[in-house]
Swiss-Prot record:
Homodimer. It comes from Neisseria meningitidis serogroup C (strain 053442). One of its GO terms (biological process) is glycine biosynthetic process from serine. This is Serine hydroxymethyltransferase. One of its GO terms (cellular component) is cytosol. CDD domains: SHMT.
Amino acid sequence: MFSKSVTLAQYDPDLAAAIAQEDQRQQDHVELIASENYVSCAVMDAQGSQLTNKYAEGYPGKRYYGGCEYVDIVEQLAIDRVKKLFGAQYANVQPHSGSQANQAVYASVLKPGDTILGMSLAHGGHLTHGASVNISGKLYNAVTYGLDENEVLDYAEVERLALEHKPKMIVAGASAYALQIDWAKFREIADKVGAYLFVDMAHYAGLVAGGEYPNPVPFCDFVTTTTHKTLRGPRGGVILCRDNTHEKALNSSIFPSLQGGPLMHVIAAKAVAFKEALQPEFKQYAKQVKINAAAMAEELVKRGLRIVSGRTESHVFLVDLQPMKITGKAAEAALGKAHITVNKNAIPNDPEKPFVTSGIRIGSAAMTTRGFNEADVRVLANLVADVLSNPEDEANLAKVREQVTALCNKYPVYGA
């Protein structure tokens, strides 16, 4: 029998110490990685619940195990809430990740060797959209589109490649593209060649939920998202459809094809996050995320930095560091010393290797969750620029770190 009175710190002090150190790091550092966010205590409570004990292969009302009557309620709550959130008729909340959700979409209607048309990883796409190092680029004949000379998504190229290659599926969505994507234009192109349209909105889902980014669901055959990032839930994935045409194929692609038992504790946490995103205050959050991203980009431009695509219309943007004569890798390290967390990121046509890069990616979701407003963000942007203009000066880094600490103390991640 397990005792509820035995704490992690008592049983495993080494692990507890590492967790405590990470907790302190999150408090003391400003998080600007676009794919990261903070979840509520309610989300963590659900994910840390005894639902982790329950195996539940199958779907609500149709399980391969007994004793699933209560986890059925949990999963159905998650399904109903996410359908309401995005106006979908179909939802599968079992994918363990966005990548597995994407794999399931491909497997539901494609055969190995079929042609897919997705955004180039080098221009801001995602590994799972046909990159040669990913299973999507190994199983399928992947053709890629990118940005035009103004660093705007090249819809003319998308149409030209679609007409030339006749893909069975067109993939839209990105992991490092700042501007809004025209889902209706993608639908028009897909219809011209009889292709399925699949949108991966993992980065934008929270903005979509908050009404600050166009909803792809009405235009697409398939939509996937992660449940973290801007949606502010646990790490996991979801598949959505505007109707139930592909329900059977998608369900079987997840189980039994790609996964076994679902992670019921994570699905419970997803349900909590979906409820949070349905609240009026989430709309204000999404609005502030966009305001903060735009303010930071604007302030960095004032300091002489170049923003890829010239601006942002979402939560994310790329900074081209080539004029600063510093690599993304070096910038990430220097900013880290100042307690500002970013990730190095390739820019379009980047001459550097993927582990070096010529840019960094900045996102506003996590700092907005903490409570940062536009004025705070402008201060922070100047601190970022201070580091990038003198990345090897330890006194400069210490001065910036002190100011970052003051900002972090003003906005604790978790209050009383």
